[in-house]
């Protein structure tokens, strides 16, 4: 702009900084949320769906969900073919220590490779959209099948500190827009995709939250957290292995 400040810095100042208080002061909001999760999950095997990546945020949130908040999550992991051993070992250690059954969906590796190559060929900025869309689509599918009313999302401002550029927000965002992804594959993918699960912006943004009443929540924004504190807790409690920088548990995002 006229002051030499880039648009990304302005987006940070407008979208992130006003909300970033390190999760302080949300005790009553969190208590009410947890009470509602337990109430709506009464009489069911699970009271929430929990997507586990093996990264720091999801690992710490699972610790809180089970050990501190006494929730009964359906723990789900998508193996899109890019897992690094550190992620798989961290997932195993935490689930074993907490006595949780881990449900794994392994994607067709050749389909994932070809979809990823299609995004490279297209010169697309959101290169992780194929794996991210599979996460969204499978969890949308689980929400319909299990009947639970809450999905726990590990995103939090304290460790993310960024927002996606506004130019990425089309439909449900590239990762949530199955129509957009299918169209890109029609132009750039060299093989038919038959086993991959797609969702749509309508299903993800309208059907699931409003017609089925399933809420996706980000509880780590409601508790005081820092990267060092989360890491220390996980190392002491579960023998968690730190993996360096953000998203370095995954070969693609690393």
Q: How would you describe each model-predicted region?
A:
Residues 48-57:
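Short, glycine-rich nucleotide/cofactor-binding loops
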């Amino acid at each position: 702009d006229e002051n030499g400040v880039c648009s990304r810095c302005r987006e940070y100042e407008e979208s992130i900084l006003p909300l970033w208080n390190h999760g302080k002061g949300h005790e009553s909001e969190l208590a009410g949320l947890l009470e509602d999760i337990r109430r709506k999950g009464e009489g069911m095997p699970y009271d929430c769906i929990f997507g586990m990546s093996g990264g720091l945020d999801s690992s710490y949130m699972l610790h809180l969900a089970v050990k501190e908040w006494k929730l009964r999550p359906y723990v789900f992991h998508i193996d899109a073919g890019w897992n690094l051993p550190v992620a798989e070992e961290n997932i195993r250690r935490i689930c074993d220590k907490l006595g949780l059954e881990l449900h794994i969906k392994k994607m067709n590796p050749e389909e994932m490779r070809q979809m990823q190559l299609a995004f490279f060929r297209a010169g697309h900025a959101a290169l992780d959209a194929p794996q991210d869309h599979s996460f969204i689509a499978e969890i949308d599918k689980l929400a319909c099948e299990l009947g639970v009313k809450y999905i726990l999302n590990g995103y939090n401002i304290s460790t993310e500190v960024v927002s996606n550029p506004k130019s990425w927000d089309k439909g449900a965002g590239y990762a949530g827009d199955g129509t957009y992804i299918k169209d890109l594959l029609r132009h750039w993918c060299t093989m038919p995709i038959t086993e991959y699960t797609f969702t749509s912006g309508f299903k993800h943004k309208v059907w699931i939250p409003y017609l089925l009443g399933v809420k996706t929540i980000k509880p780590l924004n409601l508790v005081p957290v820092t990267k060092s504190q989360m890491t220390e807790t996980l190392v002491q409690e579960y023998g968690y292995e730190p993996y360096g920088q953000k998203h370095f548990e995954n070969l693609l995002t690393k």
